[in-house]
């Protein structure tokens, strides 16, 4: 039945005026007629699709979601409509008025803002998670046609688009614009941005090139997408992440949900701590990893919409007003870049194992283990010869297929007795005992940053200085709290105290040491030299205090299981217990979690 050719006239067996005559004056949306024996939900879908795509994707999603149950029931429940279903799924069961519906379709800013704030995010996240679980299940079953269909369903769903916009407008980069200079800070702008996430006619805008300093003094280039491209990438990340997690290497820990650098360091301890553990380590360094990935490899192997992926990869970037083409690589700064980079490097463990043969006994004797965090990785081996003659050529071949190469200067093979640095930690055996401590480079970087803050705030108030120092010291200490770092923490506190004493003395050259001490240092229990402001009330000796790294409790980290998948329902109980144990460990006086 083609309603588009009937000029909106009802069938002969239907009484009453055409629906086209009952319209905006009543403040209600136009709906197509129904015929006896045909489900209304099915007719709604046919009527809207044949007349062209609705101006509001939410309408289409509500109609399509309603079609399946209607086909079984034969008709809608009395007193219900597709608007009611849309209200219940997105707005927590609140009834949408005629004025709300008109504002939703027309995009009125005030009403759109209210409806964005009224969205039931828990239900939206649950619906997206259900689709992600179905995608992961299809991957495990090898049903790639179903994977593609479910990805298409998720990336075109109203809930998926809303969640994608929510994530890019609430993360740390929400106030960083792209080349168009726009940010979606208001609810009305977010809703409008959500409606713009359409695949038909989508064009990726060039990236805005910015540079951030590296630890070696050089600068790292970042590509900042515009908000619409960012939201589109976040939308596809929702659909691609279940695939990536299901196919990922067991000992890959970078930019993955429920994993961290602490898991990678703990895996190093697990494979190197025993006396019979391998003693040789290959430290791998990929030259310009994110800048040199092969676009052709991505397009051939990443299971997503190829046209959308090609537009992202070839969008180019603008640097100082000049447009540059992108011939290779994926931009650092893109929402989806870590996911596709991880997928490109997955398979490294299998390539390393295959380098010594197919025999399980031979592999076990070679003692090969791979620990990878994004583009940083180490490989253990029983001897230097095995790593040099077997493993290293296999790794080079693996990287070459993806357009990458190892850095000859930074890739080296070392003995565990000499130690190696990995993710800011130094891993080394002392007389047969493995100790993991903060790396000297990491310590120097922290002290240089603290010294710079103190120097730049020579004339600032004590309170302003403390507020700048505390996040830096606390963040560094929290990162290193899982390794042997208690002595290091005390040493750092000592250095910082001496610099602050000089800072205080320099501000008052005509005052004595006793006066300076009483002005800037307070007593806290048995401590007489805490750098702190004066208390605001009587009896309160200390106000705002400088955070001391030595107060951080050392806690042994429990590594996540290698095969644990957050998109597999079989692991839900495991992750729930793990999150509960982590929260409990943060409470005062809590014991290390396990």
Can you name each region flagged by the protein language model?
Residues 493-499, 504-593:
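Extended C-terminal regions of large enzymes
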Residues 196, 200, 247-251, 255-259, ...:
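Conserved polymerase palm-domain catalytic core
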Residues 1-191:
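Non-catalytic, polymerase-adjacent accessory regions of viral genome-replication enzymes
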Residues 186-204:
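Amphipathic alpha-helical blocks
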Residues 402-476:
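A conserved non-catalytic segment of reverse transcriptases
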Residues 2, 7, 22, 66, ...:
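Right-hand nucleic-acid polymerase module
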Residues 203-215, 310-325, 467-470:
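Active-site-adjacent bridging/hinge elements
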């Amino acid at each position: 039945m083609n309603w588009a050719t009937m000029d909106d006239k009802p069938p002969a067996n239907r009484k009453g005026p055409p629906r086209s005559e009952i319209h905006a004056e009543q403040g209600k949306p136009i709906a197509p007629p129904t015929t006896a024996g045909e489900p209304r939900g099915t007719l709604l879908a046919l009527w809207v699709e044949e007349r062209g795509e609705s101006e509001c994707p939410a309408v289409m999603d509500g109609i399509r979601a309603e079609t399946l149950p209607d086909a079984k029931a034969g008709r809608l429940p009395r007193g219900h409509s597709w608007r009611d279903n849309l209200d219940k799924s997105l707005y927590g069961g609140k009834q949408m008025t005629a004025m709300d519906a008109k504002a939703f379709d027309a995009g009125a800013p005030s009403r759109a803002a209210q409806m964005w704030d009224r969205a039931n995010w828990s239900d939206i996240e649950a619906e997206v998670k259900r689709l992600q679980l179905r995608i992961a299940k299809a991957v495990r079953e090898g049903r790639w046609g179903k994977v593609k269909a479910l990805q298409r369903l998720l990336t075109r769903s109203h809930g998926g688009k809303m969640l994608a916009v929510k994530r890019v407008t609430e993360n740390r980069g929400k106030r960083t614009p792209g080349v168009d200079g726009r940010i979606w800070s208001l609810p009305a702008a977010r809703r409008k941005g959500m409606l713009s996430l359409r695949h038909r006619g989508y064009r990726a805008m060039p990236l805005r090139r910015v540079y951030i300093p590296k630890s070696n003094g050089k600068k790292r280039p970042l590509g900042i997408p515009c908000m619409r491209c960012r939201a589109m990438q976040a939308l596809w990340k929702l659909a691609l992440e279940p695939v990536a997690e299901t196919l990922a290497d067991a000992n890959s820990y970078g930019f993955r949900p429920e994993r961290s650098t602490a898991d990678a360091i703990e895996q190093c301890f697990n494979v190197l701590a025993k006396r019979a553990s391998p003693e040789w380590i290959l430290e791998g360094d990929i030259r310009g990893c994110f800048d040199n990935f092969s676009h052709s490899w991505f397009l051939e192997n990443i299971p997503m919409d190829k046209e959308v992926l090609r537009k992202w990869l070839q969008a180019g970037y603008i640097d100082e007003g000049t447009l540059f083409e992108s011939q290779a690589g994926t931009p650092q700064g893109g929402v989806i870049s870590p996911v596709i980079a991880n997928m490109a490097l997955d398979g490294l463990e299998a390539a390393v194992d295959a380098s010594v043969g197919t025999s399980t006994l031979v592999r076990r004797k070679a003692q090969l283990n791979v620990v990878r965090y994004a583009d940083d990785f180490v490989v253990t081996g029983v001897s230097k010869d095995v790593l040099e003659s077997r493993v290293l050529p296999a790794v080079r071949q693996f990287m070459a297929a993806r357009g990458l190469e190892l850095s000859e200067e930074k890739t080296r093979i070392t003995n565990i007795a000499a130690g190696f640095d990995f993710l800011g930690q130094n891993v080394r055996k002392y007389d047969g005992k493995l100790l993991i401590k903060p790396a000297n480079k990491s310590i120097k970087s922290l002290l240089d940053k603290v010294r710079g803050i103190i120097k730049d705030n020579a004339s600032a108030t004590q309170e302003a200085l403390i507020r700048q120092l505390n996040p830096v010291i606390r963040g560094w200490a929290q990162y290193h709290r899982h390794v042997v770092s208690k002595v290091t923490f005390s040493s750092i506190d000592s250095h910082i105290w001496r610099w602050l004493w000089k800072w205080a003395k320099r501000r008052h050259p005509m005052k004595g040491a006793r006066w300076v001490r009483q002005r800037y240092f307070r007593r806290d229990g048995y401590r007489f030299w805490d750098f702190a402001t004066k208390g605001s009330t009587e009896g309160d000796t200390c106000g705002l205090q400088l955070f001391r790294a030595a107060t951080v409790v050392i806690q042994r980290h429990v590594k996540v299981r290698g095969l644990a998948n957050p998109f597999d329902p079989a692991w839900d109980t495991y992750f729930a217990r793990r999150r509960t144990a982590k929260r409990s460990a943060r409470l005062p006086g809590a014991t290390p979690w396990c």
